[in-house]
Amino acid sequence: MKKFSLVLLTLLTMLWIPTCFAQSTEEDPRDPNAPANTIKIPGRDIYVSGMDEPSRMSWDVANSACNCRGKGWRLPTIGELQTIYQYKDLFGNFSREYYWALEMNVRSGRYYNLKFTNGKIADEEVKERNKVRCVWVPARVD
């Protein structure tokens, strides 16, 4: 009986150790400095706020609101907004409205935005009021 117990214990240990080792060597995809209530954009080193700013804002106010959150916070680029739109179910709680982007359309002098019902990109005057979802980017260490 002792021999059987020893063999069984050895087999269970052999099965458990690789699993435990594999789990312990996996990297946490989150930056340890990432702010609370943020979600990492898959495949990018950018984190999305878990919620919209409390109201619709002009572009200037939206840009200031994100920057005032602290170092690393800003409006998302139009490319980042497109990626966020693709993963909107992962991030959750998006309105069916336009969201401001960081960049300006140099031809029109208006700022880009993206509609979260259909992914349509448009541009509008800075005084228009749209939804805002800030992003955080970790500081680069070169």
PLM regions with names:
Residues W59-G72, I78-E128, V135-P138:
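An exposed tryptophan-centered "aromatic clamp" motif
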Residues L8-W16:
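Bacterial N-terminal signal peptides
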Residues M1-L8:
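Bacterial N-terminal signal peptides that target proteins for export
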Residues F21-W73, G109-N113:
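Extracellular adhesion/carbohydrate-recognition regions
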Residues V141-D142:
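Short, solvent-exposed mixed-charge patches
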